[in-house]
């Protein structure tokens, strides 16, 4: 998601909010 660099969510699955 948008926070991939911070959360380690490189696929954007966990932090897709607002993306």
UniProtKB/Swiss-Prot annotation:
Annotated GO biological process: killing of cells of another organism
Record's protein name: Cryptide Pep-2
Compartment(s): Secreted
Tissue-level expression: Expressed by the venom gland.
Entry function: Presents weak hemolytic activity at physiological concentrations (micromolar range), and weak lactate dehydrogenase (LDH) release from mast cells. Does not induce mast cell degranulation, and antimicrobial effects. In vivo, injection into mice induces very weak or no change in nociceptive sensibility, and very reduced or no edema formation. It also reduces mice locomotion, suggesting an increase in anxiety, but causes no alteration in rearing (standing on hind limbs).
Keyword Transcription regulation part of the UniProt annotation: no
Entry keywords, A to Z: Cytolysis, Secreted
Keyword Transport: no
A GO cellular component entry from the record: extracellular region
SS bond list: none
